[in-house]
Amino acid sequence: MTPDHIAAQDRVVPASDRVLTGPVTLMNSFKVSPGRDEAFHELWARTAKYFTAQPGFISLRLHRAVSADAQYRWVNVANWESEAHFRAAHGTDEFRRVVTQPGWEEFPSSPMLYQVITETS
């Protein structure tokens, strides 16, 4: 069951418990019903154009689960220079327009902001 309407605040990441310094990563998991992948991907691609043009944007990747049984079949991973850049991009009227455009109500998501704690290669 999906809501009849997803408001801009439904796409907003909760505030940090502390002031973050350095790069941050948004991980946003989406529920996409089987057979709706193409519609989701097209909507995501239109929305991505807004974010890639914002100051502080580093990169954006969209992942699809290899199992059709996954609860969240698509995951968006976006890297930003700082939390301040991320918040600025997510605080505009254009952001609110982009994330409430028709179609998004079909794809509920669970966005959260992260920082790298340990990295190995």
Feature locations, PLM:
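Glycine-rich beta-strand-turn "strand-cap" elements at beta-sheet edges
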Residues: 1-24, 61-71, 98-121
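Residue-level signal for secondary-structure boundary sites
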Residues: 36-38, 84-86, 119
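Short, well-ordered beta-strand segments in beta-rich or mixed alpha/beta enzyme
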Residues: 23-31, 61-92
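Short amphipathic alpha-helical segments
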Residues: 34-59, 94-103
